[in-house]
Amino acid sequence: MDKYSLESVLAKGAELVKRKGIKCLVIDPYNKVRDTNATSDDVNRYTMDYLSKIEQFCKKYDVLTFIVAHPTKMYKGQDGKMEEPTMYNIKGGGEWYDASYHGLLVHRNYEQKNTKVKVLKVKFQNLGENGAEAFFTWEPKSGCYIPEVIEEQQKEDLPWEA
């Protein structure tokens, strides 16, 4: 598969905003969409410039952009289990944490056969809670992830139920 340039993806995104009124753009995966106009070979500088261009695009067109960035190779810990990645495990990780408004982890646990979604960063606390997590199970018949209900959750009233 050929690599796409960030400039061409953002130009197509701008076109889709005007023609179709899109409100969300997904870049997946990050490492296949290269910033061909990058001025630095330094990974941290490259990452910061990349994220700055996306932030400018989002503000200009009032679009939410999701960037799917896979971590570097993860290793098993001393307990034999795969470590849970953080934003720092993405190449240029410090910049990902510093420059992003939000960060979500989607981590598959093969032993428990579920997937965890965890909030790693929320810039504005009224939009979420750092460390909040939810678990999902893949349902192959429907092709959907089904939320797992934890016993503690069943006992607590949700804010709109109180």
Question: Where does each model-flagged region fall?
Answer:
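Walker B catalytic acidic pair
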Residues: 29
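C-terminal regions of RecA-like/P-loop NTPase motor modules
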Residues: 3-25, 38-39, 53-61, 73-162
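Conserved H-loop
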Residues: 63, 68-70
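Alpha-helix N-cap and loop-to-helix initiation/capping positions
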Residues: 39-46
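Well-ordered, non-membrane alpha-helical segments in soluble/globular domains
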Residues: 46-52
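Residues immediately C-terminal
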Residues: 32-35
